[in-house]
């Protein structure tokens, strides 16, 4: 068995400035959910376990971690990617969605669009097993 990495993301709030100045996305237990998944990965002896909670769960930090993992992992390695927080929809600009909407993760400082996540995950080498729980 290869290397096993995990990235657990949990947001109890978002920065209202990134969401039209009013909405803070308050949720009660998303940080706890991410902490619990991280504990599971630790208990299963994952080689690397990263946890991004609320203010550290920024677009840059998530994209940077995924890029780091894409360079480090190879065939027969595993990535567990967990997200607990709000999701959203925005207008599809590249016309690849039948419903004309892209789905998003609402990160602390802005939304991460499904196309961006797909592009990041496409950087992993063939044979890396990626499990996304969202």
Located regions from the model:
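Catalytic cores of nucleophile-dependent amide-cleaving enzymes
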Residues: 6, 97, 103-134
């Amino acid at each position: 068995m290869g290397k096993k990495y995990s990235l657990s993301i949990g947001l109890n709030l978002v920065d209202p400035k990134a969401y039209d100045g009013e909405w803070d996305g308050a949720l009660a237990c998303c940080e706890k959910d991410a902490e619990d998944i991280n504990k599971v990965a630790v208990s299963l002896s994952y080689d690397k376990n990263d946890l991004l909670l609320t203010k550290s769960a920024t677009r840059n930090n998530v994209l940077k971690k995924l890029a780091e993992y894409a360079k480090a992992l190879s065939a027969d390695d595993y990535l567990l990617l967990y997200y607990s927080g709000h999701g959203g929809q925005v207008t599809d600009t590249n016309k690849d969605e039948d419903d004309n909407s892209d789905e998003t993760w609402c990160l602390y400082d802005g939304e991460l669009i499904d196309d961006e996540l797909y592009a990041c995950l496409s950087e992993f080498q063939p044979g890396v097993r990626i499990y996304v729980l969202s």
